[in-house]
Amino acid sequence: MGASQTVLPFKLGATDESLTAHCGLALFGEYLRAIDVGGLIDHELPGPGSAAGYDPSAYVLPLVFMLAGGGRTLEDLRVLRNDTGLRSLLQLDDMPSSDATGDWLRRMGATASDGLKALQRVNRGVFRRLLRRDERTGYTLDIDATQIVAEKREAHYTYKGEKGYMPMVGHIAELGLVAGHEFREGNTAPAARNLEFMQACERKMPKEKRIAAVRADSAAYQAGIFNWCEETGKVFAIGADQDAAVKAVIAAIPESDWKTFRDGEIAETVHCMNKTNRAFRLIVMRRPRDQDLFEEQSPWRYHAVASNRDNEDATATMQWYSKRGDASENRIKELKIGFGMDTMPCGTFPANAVFFSIGALTYNLYLGFRSGALGSGWERSQVQTVRWRLFQTAGKVVRHGRQVFLKISAAMLDIFTAIRERCARIMREGGVVPETS
């Protein structure tokens, strides 16, 4: 093949026209403007130290757009910074560099700045606004700790033997929203401060809403959590820690009580801990274990769930508990893989805590955009699908006087128009995020 030959028969050429390969992100930006997220950020976060500095939203919003668009590192901000067409649509006239953004993350993470607490207030304001759009009053809280591997000098080893972090995340099962998050050191036990975390999530609920149910894995198998649920009228289903007492109770279940369930058998009994105020149901599932001829261990593998859900059989409770696989574990995967929270950009824990909080904010804003602006057919779309079908739409930005025109393919025109109309309606109906106090 000669030097001038190519595989496909097209030629390259440069243009001075204002083009963007991500003009669908302008729709996401229009939604953020409709609910005035930028105003909330500037109201809550510490401002610049001088008149020449950037407002907080000038740092946060580019990170939100970058994460929603598929970027994963601070260097990916350069793609947005160099996309003059998209920036003109988003009205990002002046944008900090990736190095300046990294410095800002470190400043916000410093204890004296109070930046992390301010971001929590922003997250709470957005969360409450989105929750108020839903007609329900009682919700299920799913919590789980998740490992983020990070070969940072200051990172600690997790219980899985890898250096990194172990944040705790709480989701509202019915809507998928992140109700709360706590960025934690890698050597923090998953069982640490579970009750305090649940209570913090509850405090973020609007006054007319409440957490009515709690689900968690065996890290939350704690008497304090069970007692709190009973005292506040919550139902719970929590994986049981198979300590000696639980094993003894399981061993005492009569063989006649076991019923076929899925690929194993299920039964239930009653149990209590030393410090629980009331006894609770213990639903036990067992599956056959592959055994060696000379092994003496039990032929069964057991999985137990503690619950106070009444008026239903063991299978119904186990099925309800199993739903946390989608409601919590899969949504954490979306937060980490879909929104880039599986890698941390900075070398210090506080700066990464700020970055993770912005990731959680982006996740919730995306859910609000999907449910409020995208319309029917998108309800369960993961962000990677929306990127491929919407965000990564090519367009040409044209200026005529003071007017800006976005030229897109005819096939996308009706979709863009409908989304923009929904964003305008959201703003007319009072889209501004409420006070965070």
Language-model segment annotations:
Residues 31, 77, 317-358, 362-369:
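Short amphipathic alpha-helical "interface-anchor" segments enriched in bulky aromatics
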Residues 341-415:
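Basic, amphipathic alpha-helical segments enriched in Lys/Arg and hydrophobic/aromatic residues
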Residues 1-10, 14-17, 235-337, 422-437:
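An anionic, glycine-rich sequence signature occurring as long contiguous blocks
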Residues 226-234:
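Short, surface-exposed basic-aromatic patches at helix termini and helix-loop junctions that form
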Residues 214-222, 242-244:
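Acidic, metal-coordinating catalytic cores used for nucleic-acid/nucleotide bond scission
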Residues 1-164, 169-188, 194-207, 393-437:
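Dynamic "connector" segments at or just before major functional cores
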